[in-house]
Amino acid sequence: DRDDQQVIASAYQIAASAARHHLVLDYHGLKPFGIQRAYPNVLNFEGVKGLENSKWEPRVGDGPLHNQPRYDVTAPYLRMLAGPMDYTPGAMTNAMKDNFFGNNDHPMSQGTRVHQMAMYTTFEAPLQMLADSPTKYEREQPTTDFIRQIPTVFDEVRALDGVLGEYLVVAKRKGATWYLAAMTNWQPRDLTLTLDMLSAGSHEATLFADGVNADRDATDYRKT
């Protein structure tokens, strides 16, 4: 949680030692500063108001003090310019503004389940995380199976649409497979996208989207 000269020098020493021993690093609690150019074994950095902050987020008035969904569609435009981002996504307990509250024992996220799932494609994170309890992932097997098969590095990235603080749509290719994810703030929205990166002909897709009751139960989703 520091970035003074002593800490940065120490980070370089740790990275060099880890490289000699063929180890990779995730500098949690430290914002990116370009070290991965010299030491590509440094895979990720925190430097972001990530999911863990939900555990102690206070309520003010009719909702949480911090608007996390808006932050989630702001950080990729700004913070990710500096490098990969260890947000630690993957909450399986999800809540809308009206029923969200900070809780260390039973933490939850702001926004929908699919909002969390989309982070695994939209956020650059060569070393990715599953931040929730293992037993919750066992209970939510369709969600877990989908997250598990998303690559952490890609061959091609395209920004399809977005407005800072409002929404974003990203398509990423690994081999011959495209992964497309969209995230929004609290505002629901419909978008029309041009998928001209796909070859001519027919294509198969697995889709996850907010369910019809997601405005009341944020864990609700539909798979097609």
Question: Each predicted region: which residue ranges?
Answer:
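Aromatic- and carboxylate-enriched substrate-binding clefts and catalytic-loop regions
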Residues: 1-107
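Flexible loop/turn segments at secondary-structure boundaries
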Residues: 2-6, 32-37, 94-96, 129-131, ...
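Acidic/polar loop patches that form or flank catalytic/metal-binding clefts of enzymes
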Residues: 22-29, 52-57, 126-137, 154-158, ...
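Conserved, mostly hydrophobic/aromatic
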Residues: 25, 122, 180
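Solvent-exposed beta-strand/loop surfaces of large extracellular or lumenal domains
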Residues: 207-224
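Carbohydrate-binding surface patches
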Residues: 164-203
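Active-site proximal loops enriched in glycine and acidic residues that flank catalytic Cys/His/Asp
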Residues: 1-4, 27-30, 47, 133, ...
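Catalytic cores of secreted or luminal carbohydrate-active enzymes
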Residues: 114, 118-160
